[in-house]
């Protein structure tokens, strides 16, 4: 009698992953998160919530270049004796700017050109002295009698030249959504600092169009943003009921905030005395337009804009009271940067899993 083959049913159990592989995978994920944390922590420290740089010199002093010791601001005598003009590199309504040399180092010498605007010039000097921090160009010296100011030189110039700079081969690696968003964060950090400065709430008045805004800021060689021009920085004092007006002329265009425009229509001629004052929320209105310039049109910038859509919509609220504070905008920008960096890092981790 022929025996029938006897088939044994075998259950195929799920394939087990060796515990050592899981441990290595978990370690890799933890290491990735640790590195990300350290990077973001270093980044936030570089921006800092502390207004004054820990390495900043005492009031009336400066540290220049790699020199560790602090030196007193240069006096009239020292400027006249030690600073040599090289060439004129700019001229505005208030002052002329000269690339100069001091002890074989490039510096910037600014001189008043219009005596009628000396109050603006001296106001700018006062602000520069009082607001020395990681957000403000470094003051090296001044001479009130001769209306001259000496500051640190930044070869990349104002933010107006940002896109041209990013197309230079040396800096093309910086032309990413990540670096551009960091510049926008720097800019908002400056606004937040001015709104909570040691002097009180200051409004950046020299900002009636995008080009004018960009001209007020410098791009440093390590790609950070510094405010450079503080000639028009009035103080808001709510407790005293004091608001501000940016100049005495009628302002036009969508770039300036609605409350900065003449509210009584074209049939009523503009009169400065009838123009209502306003507060620092005019600066908030302009943030989306300035940030849009920073973000440019590189790969990934549209994703950043999408994540910033809600906060930018809030910045554009017609009622100034409904707009966020500069601190709220800054917090949102930082959260978006953290989120996008995590998303950029996680795809590799998901594939490992």
Where are these regions (language model features)?
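Activation segment/activation loop of eukaryotic-type protein kinase catalytic domains
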Residues: 205-268
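Conserved C-terminal C-lobe helix
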Residues: 301-318
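ATP-binding glycine-rich loop module of kinase domains
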Residues: 73-130, 136-138, 144-146
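Conserved structural core of kinase catalytic domains
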Residues: 138-183
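Protein kinase catalytic-loop region centered on the HRD/HxD motif
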Residues: 189-208
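Terminal C-lobe "cap" of eukaryotic-type protein kinase domains
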Residues: 318-344
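Juxta-kinase regulatory segment immediately upstream of eukaryotic protein kinase catalytic domains
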Residues: 2-88
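Regulatory extensions appended to serine/threonine kinase catalytic cores
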Residues: 342-353
């Amino acid at each position: 009698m022929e025996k029938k083959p006897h088939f044994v049913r075998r259950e195929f159990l799920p394939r087990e992953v060796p515990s050592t592989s899981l441990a290595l995978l978990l370690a890799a994920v933890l290491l990735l998160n640790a590195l990300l944390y350290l990077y973001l922590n270093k980044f936030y420290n570089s921006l800092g919530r502390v207004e004054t740089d820990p390495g900043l010199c005492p009031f009336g002093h400066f540290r220049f270049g790699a020199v560790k010791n602090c030196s007193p601001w240069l006096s009239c005598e020292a400027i006249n004796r030690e600073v040599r003009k090289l060439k004129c590199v700019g001229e505005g309504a208030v002052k002329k700017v000269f690339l100069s040399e001091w002890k074989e180092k490039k510096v910037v010498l600014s001189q008043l050109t219009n005596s009628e605007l000396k109050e603006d010039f001296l106001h700018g000097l006062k602000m520069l002295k009082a607001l020395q921090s990681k957000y403000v160009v470094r003051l090296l010296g001044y001479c009130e009698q001769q209306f001259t100011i000496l500051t640190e030189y930044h070869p990349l110039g104002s933010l107006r030249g940002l896109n041209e700079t990013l197309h230079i081969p040396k800096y093309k690696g910086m032309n990413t959504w990540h670096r551009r968003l960091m510049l926008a964060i720097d800019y908002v950090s400056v606004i937040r600092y001015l709104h909570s400065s040691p002097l009180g709430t200051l409004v950046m008045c020299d900002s009636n169009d995008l080009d004018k805004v960009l001209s007020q800021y410098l791009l440093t060689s390590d790609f950070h943003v510094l405010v450079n021009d503080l000639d028009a920085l009035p103080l808001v004092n709510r407790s005293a009921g004091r608001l501000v007006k940016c100049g005495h002329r009628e302002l036009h265009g969508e770039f300036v905030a609605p409350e900065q425009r003449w509210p009584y229509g074209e049939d009523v001629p503009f009169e400065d005395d009838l123009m209502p004052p306003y507060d620092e929320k005019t600066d908030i209105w302009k943030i989306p337009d300035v940030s849009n310039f920073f973000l440019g049109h590189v790969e990934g910038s549209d994703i950043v804009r999408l994540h910033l859509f809600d906060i930018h919509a809030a910045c554009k609220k017609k009622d100034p009271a409904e707009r966020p504070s500069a601190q709220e905008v800054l917090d949102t920008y930082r959260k978006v940067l953290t989120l996008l960096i995590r998303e950029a890092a996680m795809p590799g981790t998901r594939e490992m899993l």
